[in-house]
């Protein structure tokens, strides 16, 4: 489909053949391209700095208007400066925790600092740093950060806290350094709900990669667990797959991991885990999108409904080019409505067997009680 989502996504591929680069260059050089739609989509997908970095790597920036290229360069430079601050902060935090014998396992964006998943250090957009710690060290770690000027992040309050017995959280309340505007989340598990039960903290620690960051010892997820964590986090916690809101930044990281670690990632084991938990449709569609948009080489299982879900996810953004006609104008709305109906159609499963809550909250009486208390 000729949408802004698809065209931006194709630019985010970690590598391109000469033929693929030529095809993409021809599409970007079309005079009817709507650059405002592309920029808006890159921003929505949290992928603008990475978009600029990949365009530079692929030699495609020449096809952009000069003012847009200059604007993207400024955003990329600002994000690079922000990431340098985050790297400095991570080194400081690790030094403090190392001195107290507190082991740290880096998650998500923080892990990319350790292995330089993105050669361009300004490419990855980050809102915070996620650190997994053994549960017995959480309070000491929190106290140490508060001694360094961190406070409870007033913006990091979930509306689902009203649910009694909620197991929605995977970390203690976020800590923000008010002066440096940096937030650190101290995790005791990798994710809440079903993803956290699929990939446990114990499993993560048992196969973690050991290394150093600026002289400080640190761990991060093995490539197999990292890919699994990415796919689960991108599609499950906030019902992203059901709502049709899977972010290109997450798909791009999935593709980057597959490209960086082709020997360490075991597709057969990956899909065995996914099938065991009945997630082959959302995760299979997610991997299919990575393959179609970003040339990811991971094998995907044959899923009968994958093409339908692919269309639902890919076609809900505005057209990439200015086109007249009722169909072109209303196609994104049509697919957004389809995603909304699909999401609402799954509400009974979400309510009675909620992936966001613990196993003890899956019975009908318990769920009705929680709903009643929330309304009251």
What are these regions (language model features)?
Residues 1-127, 133-376:
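Conserved NTP-donor binding/palm subdomain of two-metal-ion nucleotidyltransferases/polymerases, i.e.
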């Amino acid at each position: 489909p000729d949408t802004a989502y698809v065209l931006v996504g194709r630019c985010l591929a970690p590598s391109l053949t000469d033929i693929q680069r030529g095809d993409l260059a021809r599409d970007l050089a079309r005079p009817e391209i709507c650059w405002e739609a592309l920029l808006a989509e890159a921003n929505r997908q949290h992928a603008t700095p990475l978009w600029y970095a990949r365009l530079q790597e692929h030699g495609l920036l020449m096809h952009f208007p000069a003012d847009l290229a200059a604007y993207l360069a400024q955003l990329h430079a600002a994000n690079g400066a922000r990431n340098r601050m985050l790297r400095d902060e991570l080194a400081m935090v690790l030094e403090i925790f190392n001195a107290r014998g507190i082991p740290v396992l880096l998650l998500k964006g923080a892990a990319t600092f350790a292995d330089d998943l993105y050669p361009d250090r300004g490419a990855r957009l980050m809102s915070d740093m996620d650190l997994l710690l053994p549960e017995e060290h959480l309070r000491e770690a929190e106290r140490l950060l508060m001694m360094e000027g961190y406070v409870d992040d007033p913006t990091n309050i979930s509306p689902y806290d009203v649910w009694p017995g909620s197991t929605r959280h995977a970390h203690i309340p976020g800590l923000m350094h008010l002066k440096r505007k940096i937030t650190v989340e101290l995790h005791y598990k990798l994710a809440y709900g079903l993803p956290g039960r699929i990939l446990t903290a114990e499993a993560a620690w048992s196969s973690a990669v050991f290394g150093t960051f600026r002289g400080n010892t640190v761990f991060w997820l093995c490539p197999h667990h990292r890919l699994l964590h990415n796919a689960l986090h991108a599609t499950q916690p906030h019902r992203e797959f059901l709502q049709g809101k899977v972010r290109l930044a997450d798909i791009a990281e999935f593709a980057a991991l597959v490209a960086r670690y082709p020997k360490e990632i075991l597709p057969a084991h990956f899909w065995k885990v996914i099938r065991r938990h009945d997630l082959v449709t959302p995760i299979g569609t997610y991997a299919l999108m990575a393959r179609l948009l970003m040339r990811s080489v991971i094998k995907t299982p044959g899923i009968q409904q994958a093409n339908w879900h692919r269309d639902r996810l890919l076609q809900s953004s505005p057209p990439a080019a200015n086109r007249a006609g009722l169909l072109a104008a209303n196609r994104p709305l049509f697919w957004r409505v389809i995603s909304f109906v699909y999401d609402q159609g799954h509400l009974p499963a979400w309510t009675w067997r909620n992936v966001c809550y613990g196993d003890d909250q899956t019975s009908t009486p318990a769920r009705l009680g929680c709903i009643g208390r929330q309304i009251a």
